[in-house]
């Protein structure tokens, strides 16, 4: 029995992994929930095992990032027309033949971004589009790091999104403007990484 108790205690200690968070989170509970689908990247790494050196690919990445920022701001404002326009622009960029020449992990991220963007185009409702933002954002941030595109990018995190599972987005400004909750919880989140 004693061995069983020790084994249980060790298992519990390892499972809990008592890590402390270094960033301060600003969180507010407004009672609303989001349904998370098609995205399981809550614990992720944005460290690429590749680089994007081609000037043409870097320009496509800059263009995609600009359209992404428009999408993100549309989600913050809950503006369906703005998010639809941005998602369609992102789809045009992501399907560029030269962008899809990338191989390995870079190709995997481009493919994931493409799937997320296509889903956003298919679902013009802002709430539906938010379901694909986390996956899109983590892949985009990895690509931005690999591309070294010389622009500011902040990986930000909302701990409250999707029933407290948390979710990421990328911003061109350090200021928190939460695209998952918009004006309901505009300042909920923290900067996790900066380029």
Residue ranges and their predicted role:
Residues 24-52:
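Post-signal peptide N-terminal segment of mature Sec-exported envelope proteins
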Residues 16-20:
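Bacterial signal peptide processing site
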Residues 1-14:
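Sec-dependent bacterial lipoprotein signal peptides
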């Amino acid at each position: 029995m004693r061995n069983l108790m020790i084994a249980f205690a060790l298992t519990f200690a390892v499972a809990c992994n008592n890590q402390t968070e270094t960033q301060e989170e600003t969180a507010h509970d407004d009672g609303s929930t989001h349904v998370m689908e098609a995205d399981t990247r809550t614990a992720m790494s944005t460290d690429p095992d590749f680089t994007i050196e081609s000037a043409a690919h870097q320009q496509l990445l800059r263009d995609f990032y600009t359209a992404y920022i428009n999408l993100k701001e549309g989600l913050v404002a809950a503006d369906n027309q703005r998010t639809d326009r941005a998602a369609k622009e992102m789809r045009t960029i992501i399907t560029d033949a030269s962008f899809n020449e990338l191989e390995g992990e870079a190709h995997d991220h481009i493919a994931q971004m493409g799937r997320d963007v296509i889903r956003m185009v298919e679902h013009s409702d802002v709430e539906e589009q938010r379901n694909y933002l986390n996956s899109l954002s983590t892949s985009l941030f990895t690509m931005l790091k690999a591309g070294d595109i010389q622009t500011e990018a902040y990986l930000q995190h909302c701990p409250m999104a999707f029933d407290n599972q948390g979710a990421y987005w990328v911003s061109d400004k350090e200021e928190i403007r939460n695209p998952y909750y918009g004006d309901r919880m505009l300042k909920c989140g923290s900067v996790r990484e900066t380029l």
